Amino acid sequence: MTNCVPLSFVQSCVGHRGAARFFHSRLYKNRLDKDVYLCNNLINAYLETGDSVSARKVFDEMPLRNCVSWACIVSGYSRNGEHKEALVFLRDMVKEGIFSNQYAFVSVLRACQEIGSVGILFGRQIHGLMFKLSYAVDAVVSNVLISMYWKCIGSVGYALCAFGDIEVKNSVSWNSIISVYSQAGDQRSAFRIFSSMQYDGSRPTEYTFGSLVTTACSLTEPDVRLLEQIMCTIQKSGLLTDLFVGSGLVSAFAKSGSLSYARKVFNQMETRNAVTLNGLMVGLVRQKWGEEATKLFMDMNSMIDVSPESYVILLSSFPEYSLAEEVGLKKGREVHGHVITTGLVDFMVGIGNGLVNMYAKCGSIADARRVFYFMTDKDSVSWNSMITGLDQNGCFIEAVERYKSMRRHDILPGSFTLISSLSSCASLKWAKLGQQIHGESLKLGIDLNVSVSNALMTLYAETGYLNECRKIFSSMPEHDQVSWNSIIGALARSERSLPEAVVCFLNAQRAGQKLNRITFSSVLSAVSSLSFGELGKQIHGLALKNNIADEATTENALIACYGKCGEMDGCEKIFSRMAERRDNVTWNSMISGYIHNELLAKALDLVWFMLQTGQRLDSFMYATVLSAFASVATLERGMEVHACSVRACLESDVVVGSALVDMYSKCGRLDYALRFFNTMPVRNSYSWNSMISGYARHGQGEEALKLFETMKLDGQTPPDHVTFVGVLSACSHAGLLEEGFKHFESMSDSYGLAPRIEHFSCMADVLGRAGELDKLEDFIEKMPMKPNVLIWRTVLGACCRANGRKAELGKKAAEMLFQLEPENAVNYVLLGNMYAAGGRWEDLVKARKKMKDADVKKEAGYSWVTMKDGVHMFVAGDKSHPDADVIYKKLKELNRKMRDAGYVPQTGFALYDLEQENKEEILSYHSEKLAVAFVLAAQRSSTLPIRIMKNLRVCGDCHSAFKYISKIEGRQIILRDSNRFHHFQDGACSCSDFW
């Protein structure tokens, strides 16, 4: 038979369908189609060409079949991906008991391995049969068993059992089990087996060391010391110059960041290939050594055949150039030209992807778009590179549109694509689209790994969906550092979830999570908002323990925390240690701390120090300082800071401009605020809101509403919740009841803004000031949320102004206030005022007794004026001022002139059941009257407006007296109390007596 059909001819048919058919015809012609050996070769030849039908026909027509016949048909079908048919052959083979030698077992087990998890059922049965036939101890067969158990079901235990049954283990046996432990990430067991291998006398091969190197690199942070030990062992074995081993070591050292060792191995290698080059280049790029990676490529380009992957890595090096981004971009364009010339860009999708990625990272998004557009073939990486590049370059809308286009092309998004798309949605605050992407990913069965889940948490946190953020975090099987930072940061940004943020931080600690500066910054932000000073100190201690207390980000967060908790000594200690690390955030935090703790002199000293030492104040710092001066109505200091902002060329900045509008309106210079507002080149919501609130605060409700209409017509800035607080306040101060309800209803009807508690408070004030107490009571009962302290205090104040009418409603409001704020003296004073206004002196005595029993002290009322020589402060009946005699003399003169003009003291505001004469005397010495008398006595010939600030609300008698004084003296008086501004001129007030 062999003379008719030479063996060499039989072997030449493998892989050639035509030759196989010719061979088949020769068998028929020579009547050799029943020969088992030749038929087995024919089956193998057909299967090698993928012709399973012809192979099956030959197999079925064989009168006799041996184990090789079955092995050929099973392994061939499995190799061609026809696993179900291979499974059927396996069953038939087992039934017929065709197992004549160990080589048949090898073929069958490999087929089981290729079939996968289904084939493992038969693999186990065959394993059992091997025990009966004593083949389980054979190294060749058991080596395949080890591989099958690991690749099919990932079972280290079964693989180890198969390894243990081998009587005489060869190097393949040892390499197989070491490879299993390496892939399983069990570093200790892999090296324990390696030690046993050496003890057994087996010589390690290049594959042994390859697995060990892989094991050392499988850790999250590769063990450099372990790699060094492996390298020493490899040197002793003489395999360091081996191409496979050397390339693996270079890649391993490069991945671990130990580039000195990577270069050392690279230089010692006798031969190198593209894999070796790529491994070292990847390490250089990871360390952001773009120039070195480029130089290495240029040096090796003429010595080895570089692969297309080498060009992809080279392109990734250009964005990492340390000198200038433009240099890297220029080099990238040169390589782009080279790959076009060589034609690589036309048939290598990877190079096109590398070009898109390179241009995007170098900031040339237009070039990235161009490359992407002209790519004939695009895979998921192409789309991901483009979407990620758009997101990183701030083209968020286009990134989202590219994602939609990608889905229209039926390309499934990968993890990186989802992360970039969700990031763009978060930047755009497009929660709905983000939810759609989330839902589609779940529907498609895409694995939402830790990184994607983190991106989802960021999206929901940025768009205010805190509950969704919590759900994502809870559903994650594992959390990394970013996960904890995301949830803690999201909770810390929500006022209602601040305690939860602290609890979450503690849980992260208990879970053994490594904490970084972002974690500490977030939790310190929550602690500072809660004013938990002691907890802040404990977290400071943890930061020291974690060796990150000296990082600028952490120190800035600590300064902000200590400042808000009133621990300025702690702030100053940290600030003094940061001499070389201070940035704008540091200075801002320190100044804000001083301002928060009412240390305005120190805040201003720090500002002047910054200016003298050449520090540049940014817009937010100016805004912070201006806001502080606005809160205490220090006009002169505010104007000084304004001058500094002009010198710094920041006057036109929208943040500074808005702060200036707010400062001038709060300091009584509404004319300056309006003038500056009108000259602003750009306005944001803060600008409009400050001006509208300024009008409302100064009693110019009509002007506030006109400006609101202008804002709507402008169309650039939609009204927000703060805008409507100003609008409703304007209606309240101007007594515009119908207008108030119209704007209140328009919030939800026209702008989709759900009214908040502060808006309900404004409406309660509108009704209260209009004297509509019955409607006010009905309004409160129908509120969708429980009234808070501000609303009940508004109700009580309205009852005070009603001269005792609806006293029961006022009493109810007072009782609610005593429950909510039992230690606030204002609540007791308001109740007393209500009883006094109605002449209910016995109830007034009871209210004062209740206040005394609660050990609550009333805040002293005081007024102050700013003169050239400083600030002068006055309290009621005070005679400690150096010019007290002059002041009281002037006051008597004013009282006489006012009486002559028709002034009658409103003794109801004396709040005591005293004789009429005593009440009048008490009213005469209120702090604001002392202040105005002082200014009039000190500035006899001046015609400038008199500006007086008061910490409490002005009483009705002083309000009446100031109208008379303004007319008698011919001076405008501007009084700012705790509620609003009053402009007195020619016997009238800007509030039209509606206050």
From Swiss-Prot:
Carries keyword Repeat?
Answer: yes
Give me any GO biological process, just one: RNA modification
What are the start and end residues of each PPR repeat?
A: 35-65, 66-100, 101-137, 138-169, 170-204, 205-241, 242-276, 278-303, 307-342, 348-378, 379-413, 414-448, 449-483, 484-515, 516-550, 551-581, 583-617, 618-652, 653-683, 684-718, 720-750, 756-786
Answer yes or no on keyword Repeat: yes
Annotated segments matching region Type E motif: 791-868
Positions of region (Type DYW motif): 900-995
This protein's name: Putative pentatricopeptide repeat-containing protein At5g09950
What organism, scientifically named, is this protein from?
Answer: Arabidopsis thaliana
